[in-house]
Amino acid sequence: MKEIIRSIKGMHDYIPDDVITWQYIEYIVKRILKNYCYNEIRFPLIEKTSLFAHSIGNITDIIEKEMYSFKDKKNKKITLRPEGTIGCMRACINKGLLRTSKQKLWYLGPMFRYERPQHGRYRQFHQFGIEVLGMSGPDIDLEIILLVERILRTLNISNYVQLELNSIGSYESRLHYKKILFSYFKQYEACLDEDCKRRLYVNPLRILDSKDKNIKAIINNAPILMDFIDDNSLIHFENLCKLMKNIGISYVVNYKLVRGLDYYNKTVFEWKTNLLGAKDAICAGGRYDNLSKSLGVTFIPAIGCAIGMERLVLLIKSLKLKPKTNNAIDVFIIFLKDNIQIEAIKLSELVRTQFPKKKIMLSILSSNLRKQFSTANKIKARIVLLLGPNEVKNNLILLKDLTSGYQKSFLKNKIIEELELAFKN
């Protein structure tokens, strides 16, 4: 017996029952993004490896360990995108979108990272990305936060997440802070795990992300970045906090919150939940004003965030908030003889044309009326249209409403009129 080929580790299939929740989330998020005047952008899953190396930073986990990179047939190094912000910025630069106007954009799609698969973290995962390019004030930071808050409220999960906020200042202030952190963590090097020991020498900021309980105690007493950030970043953060207070947005300042990518600056934020274990961030983002310069163009202020679809689905399912769906079939068409099949197909296409929002199913059986009606009941069909030899001979159609038991025969040319009447009842 041949070995069954299975999906790649860390990459998942989503069957129709799973997709119902995904589609519900996508519908809500897209509706709200449209409400806020954000436009969709699409860009490739594969980019030149150098794009990410220049932008993310050579000493991040993504560059060092997690990227899916390989050489194409021309020996050029390419990478499956590990996140969407950089590709979005590149696309906007290449297409000249930032020459004439500011951009408010969104995208949805798969990202790829070679991580150890675990609950809520996969090697292929999906993100809703929200990006604003060309705006620098705290007011646009506020808009992004308001937008995500609205999404969470509409999905009925806002009571189960907490917004955490911080400022990581400028690149220069972080360089100074890294030296302070190095000196602090160096005292506890013997207590650090192997990963944190490595981070100590390449990027001590990343130690702040450790989930190890023993290391958490050391982190809690570490110097805070807010004490070392530049005045401009501090004023920006204070103004944002004032705006949020005036609007009435609940948040906590987490002085240990940093982002895993080097291009971030100033405002950073995460929505976290305690219902999904250690991998608790549902949405994360911040400002990345210097990303454009790392891509070789002029300064373009920017802010964005990414909503993790898989984690959002897990949270909704854990709360038993799975959306109610109507899987019932509106019209089930039955034919009783093989030689009537063409007439039945024509009828089904006519009904689909006239009622494009209704669910129309054509029976695959051509005999045994009892079995066909049994099928109609199993699929929760509301209306059955029956074509038998007598109906075809007399140019008739039999309609039966399985909800009320009402049935009626009528001339074929009355089908639209009769269905409209049946749908109203």
From Swiss-Prot:
Catalytic reaction equation(s): tRNA(His) + L-histidine + ATP = L-histidyl-tRNA(His) + AMP + diphosphate + H(+)
Alphabetical GO biological process terms: histidyl-tRNA aminoacylation
Gene3D superfamilies in the cross-refs: Anticodon-binding domain (3.40.50.800), Bira Bifunctional Protein, Domain 2 (3.30.930.10)
PROSITE patterns: AA_TRNA_LIGASE_II
InterPro entries: aa-tRNA-synth_II, aa-tRNA-synth_II/BPL/LPL, Anticodon-bd, Anticodon-bd_dom_sf, His-tRNA-ligase, HisRS-like_core, HisRS/HisZ
GO terms of molecular function: ATP binding; histidine-tRNA ligase activity
Subcellular location: Cytoplasm
Pfam families on file: HGTP_anticodon (PF03129), tRNA-synt_His (PF13393)
Chief localization: cytoplasm
Top-level taxon of origin: Bacteria
Gene Ontology cellular-component annotations: cytoplasm
EC number(s) on file: 6.1.1.21
Keywords: Aminoacyl-tRNA synthetase, ATP-binding, Cytoplasm, Ligase, Nucleotide-binding, Protein biosynthesis
Subunit-level organization: Homodimer.
HAMAP family: His_tRNA_synth
NCBIfam families: hisS
Family: Belongs to the class-II aminoacyl-tRNA synthetase family.
Name of the protein described by the UniProt record: Histidine--tRNA ligase
